[in-house]
Amino acid sequence: MIPWLAANDRFPPVERALEEPNGLLAAGADLSLARLIQAYESGIFPWYSEGQPLLWWSPDPRMVLFPSELKIQRSLKKRIGRRDFEVRADTSFEEVISACSEPRSGQEGTWITGDMVAAYAALAGAGHAHSIETWIGGELAGGLYGVALGRMFYGESMFTRAPDASKIALAHLVRQLERWDFGMIDCQMKTAHLARFGAREIARADFMRKLVNLVNYPRSTRKWRLDDDLFD
């Protein structure tokens, strides 16, 4: 059994999360700005589908990417070297999250519900959520979004409309975060795609120890601007 959270209830300790399904911790509450920030500070994220209650997760192990461990495959390096694109930050957050919410091939629905879109748009408006966007020929070709607290970044979702567009965005994000001394990127669940970039699983206890330090750095709420020389 998992607890059902009322509006003012705090999250239970992440150690109480279920083993199956891995990481399910609680249900209920809301997607208010304060609740989402509290969740991320606590190593918890929302994940649910249309028609389900609001579910909160903290899996063990946790997939993370340390910026200094970024791996870029040779083919992507060549693609980046062509410089026939522009990577921007925070110019089209709502377009990025809306694109991420579109059902993927082979999927019937999406976990990025209308309520989630509105909640993360509010986070972006408050300066805590950011989008990284790949533009080709003046069109948004791919990108990703996530949450930043202190020197911790939480990746949420990505999309692509052109070959390698989301990969280009991710590579630029990680290079920039390393330059800004961010310590860790939360990738939540294991995927082969992120593993190719150097992401790996660590124990939830290790994740939480690192998280506590990283989220306590000063928090900027300014819109991001990426450096122009990340791949010079």
Language model features: what each stretch is:
Residues 1-232:
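N-acyltransferase acceptor-side catalytic subdomain
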